[in-house]
Amino acid sequence: MTEGSSTEMGLCTWMSDLPDELLDFPVICLAIPGSHDSMSYTIKRGARLAPDCLPILYRLSPYLGPIVRRLSYNWCITQHATASVQLLNGIRYFDLRVSKKNDVDGFYFVHSSYGAKINEELKTINEFLEDFRHE
């Protein structure tokens, strides 16, 4: 890691580094850093519109499909950092929005458009928790 990195600053272990007097606090009493639409970075340009998309975009989609998807993409990406990077930077609360596709098995992350299947990203989170057991 480089000087000033999240590992050096302790962001990836901030929960493990809490003082003993805070360890007995209910988690609801702590301010926990989180990210909004945490997995939106998995959405690719031109992705299919998701059920949480604005109704007007659904109505326009049959006529202006590529333009509508480009417009949706421009505002649906609220995170550029991967789940792994977010965790290493101290994020401990993920805003996960999930939906199914009508014609495909599995669950996908969404924010106006469909992103990745949830399995791989959840594996990444699990790997972090295996490496940092007290987080």
Which role fits each region the language model picked out?
Residues E135:
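Active-site-proximal binding-pocket segments
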Residues R92:
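Extracytoplasmic glycan-interaction modules
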Residues M1-N89, N102-E120, T124-F132:
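Long, acidic (Asp/Glu-rich), low-complexity accessory segments flanking structured domains
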Residues V98:
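A cross-family signal for N-terminal binding/gating loops and helix N-caps
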